[in-house]
Amino acid sequence: MSNIVWHDHKVTRAERSANKNQKPCLLWFTGLSGSGKSTIANALDVALHERGYHTFLLDGDNVRHGLCSDLGFSDDDRVENIRRVGEVCKLFADAGLIVMSAFISPFTSDRRMVRKLFPAGEFIEVFMDAPLETCESRDPKGLYKKARAGEIKHFTGIDSPYEVPSHPEIRLDTSQSTVDECVDSLIAYLQERELIKSN
């Protein structure tokens, strides 16, 4: 690493944000499989896009088709998966975008690692706090059924732990709130902190 140096860009992060007339941030959706991470993140992405904001959504399954296709689901691979994703999120935010990421990200230390990449107030942890029973009853990919049958090992919530965020910026329970209600809560949070404009 001693022969590698950091090159500053001529166009700054602040200038890129000003050009887009918005403030960059990362909304980090975390929770069990089936808790609504991708659903709510996608709905928020649409809502922000319709308001004219420049956004990008990174989804756990999609990232494993390319950037992280060489990784499995061991604890070490999960850590590396989140490390890579965190660095990519930072690059998107440096480009002035509002970034959303939807990853189980079960370990507190990994989420803390990503938080440290961002200036204060720009990392927004969104804990999808749906009960395991709700997530398992949805089971959109049939993964819980396979995990219960022993066909999938290291499945979060079944035989691998999920460390619940102690102080997330936002907590949403999709067993109690609709998609629209969740999006409204997220929009309100962003407006209150002047990350987006109030209507």
Curated annotation (Swiss-Prot):
InterPro entries: APS_kinase, P-loop_NTPase. It comes from the Bacteria. Pathway: Sulfur metabolism; hydrogen sulfide biosynthesis; sulfite from sulfate: step 2/3. The keyword Transferase applies. Keywords: ATP-binding, Kinase, Nucleotide-binding, Phosphoprotein, Transferase. ATP binds at residues 31-38. Disulfide bonds: none annotated. Its EC number is 2.7.1.25. Signal peptide: none annotated. It catalyses: adenosine 5'-phosphosulfate + ATP = 3'-phosphoadenylyl sulfate + ADP + H(+). Gene3D superfamilies: P-loop containing nucleotide triphosphate hydrolases (3.40.50.300). GO terms for biological process: hydrogen sulfide biosynthetic process; sulfate assimilation. The active site is at 105 (phosphoserine intermediate). One of its GO terms (molecular function) is ATP binding. PANTHER family: ADENYLYL-SULFATE KINASE 1, CHLOROPLASTIC, BIFUNCTIONAL 3'-PHOSPHOADENOSINE 5'-PHOSPHOSULFATE SYNTHASE. Belongs to the APS kinase family. Catalyzes the synthesis of activated sulfate. This is Adenylyl-sulfate kinase. The gene is cysC.
